[in-house]
């Protein structure tokens, strides 16, 4: 969880730095005419309508909305996987562990040789093998 916060902080500082430098250098005066471009159109003008290059892709990858989008996709995939696992119970052993605990509890009386004696009795006790549970009172 901490690395996600670190990525958000890095993305925020990177986008802050790049927008600050592009807005400062976007105003240029040549031969008495003023050409002002906004940071949103500077990237489009720099690419001349061609495919995005490595610097543009790096800037896009470092932006905050891309990281939050990836975080949203990761969260959705994780929730969907958890939901499918709960509904189908084919990938994990969540319901299997409950059934194992139940069977271990019920089978202990029939298979254990050192079963505890009922209160108030002395001597040895053998659990019934015919499936009757609990044992009849003495």
UniProtKB/Swiss-Prot annotation:
Alphabetized InterPro entries for the sequence: Herpes_UL139_cytomegalovirus
Protein name: Membrane glycoprotein UL139
Lineage: Viruses, Duplodnaviria, Heunggongvirae, Peploviricota, Herviviricetes
Any single GO CC term annotated in Swiss-Prot or TrEMBL for this entry: host cell membrane
Mode of membrane association: Single-pass membrane protein
Organism (species): Human cytomegalovirus (strain Merlin)
Keywords: Host membrane, Membrane, Signal, Transmembrane, Transmembrane helix
Highest taxon listed in the record's lineage: Viruses
TM ranges: 64-84
Signal sequence residues: 1-15
Polar residues bias (residue ranges): 113-129
Localization in the cell: Host membrane
Keyword Signal: yes
């Amino acid at each position: 969880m901490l690395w996600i916060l670190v990525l958000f902080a890095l993305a925020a500082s990177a986008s802050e730095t790049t927008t600050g430098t592009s807005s400062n250098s976007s105003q240029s005066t040549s031969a008495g005419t003023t050409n002002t471009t906004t940071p949103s159109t500077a990237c489009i003008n720099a690419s001349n309508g061609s495919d995005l290059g490595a610097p543009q892709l790096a800037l896009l990858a470092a932006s905050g909305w891309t990281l939050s989008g990836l975080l949203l996709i990761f969260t959705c995939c994780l929730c969907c996987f958890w939901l499918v696992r709960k509904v189908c119970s084919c990938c994990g052993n969540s319901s299997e562990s409950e059934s194992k605990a139940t069977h271990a509890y019920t089978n202990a009386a029939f298979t254990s040789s050192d079963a505890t004696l009922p209160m108030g009795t002395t001597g040895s006790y053998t659990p019934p093998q015919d499936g009757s549970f609990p044992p009849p009172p003495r």
